[in-house]
């Protein structure tokens, strides 16, 4: 199955794919899955206790990094539709975690910022992930980190 997918994506006939490369790709997929599950475990638990999910975390994270972010900018960052963003953003606003202001330059533009409670939650969520990454980086060293960063930068456009 994976080999067929690889052929569709690469245009290379299945019989020309290096099986060791195929196996390494499968191993990378599995490692990526387990790493992501571990990376999100603590935030998922915190979010679940509050009736929230990963989409809420992503919104909190990017609004926290970009105060006064407007809704269209957030849509571009997240790569979702207005419809997909509407319910989770409304919930965060209703819970008092996100504040919505009208932009001074254009009354049609809504700008988003974290409230104090939102900033506290976002810090708690992100801190657990920052610590998780820091432990892994310490174990692997700078050379491995440089390689990992290159891979992560290339994945969105691969």
Task: Mark where each language-model region is.
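Residues within helix-turn-helix
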Residues: 71-72, 83, 90, 110
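N-terminal helix-turn-helix DNA-binding core of bacterial DNA-binding proteins
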Residues: 41-81
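Short, locally clustered residues in the helix-turn-helix/winged-helix DNA-binding domain
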Residues: 33, 61-65, 126
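Charged, amphipathic alpha-helical coiled-coil/dimerization segments
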Residues: 40, 90-150
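N-terminal leader segment of winged-helix/HTH proteins
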Residues: 1-50
């Amino acid at each position: 199955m994976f080999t067929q997918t690889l052929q569709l994506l690469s245009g290379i006939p299945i019989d020309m794919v290096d099986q060791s490369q195929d196996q390494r790709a499968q191993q990378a997929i599995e490692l990526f899955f387990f790493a992501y599950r571990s990376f999100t475990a603590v935030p998922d638990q915190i979010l679940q206790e509050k009736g929230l999910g990963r989409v809420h975390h992503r919104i909190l994270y990017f609004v926290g990094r970009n105060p006064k972010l407007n809704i269209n900018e957030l849509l571009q960052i997240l790569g979702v539709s207005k419809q997909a963003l509407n319910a989770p953003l409304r919930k965060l606003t209703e819970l008092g975690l996100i504040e919505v202001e009208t932009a001074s330059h254009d009354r049609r533009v809504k700008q988003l910022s974290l409230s104090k409670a939102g900033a506290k939650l976002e810090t708690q969520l992100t801190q657990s992930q920052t610590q998780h990454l820091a432990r892994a980086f310490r174990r692997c060293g700078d050379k491995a980190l440089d390689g990992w960063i290159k891979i992560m930068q290339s994945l969105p456009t691969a």
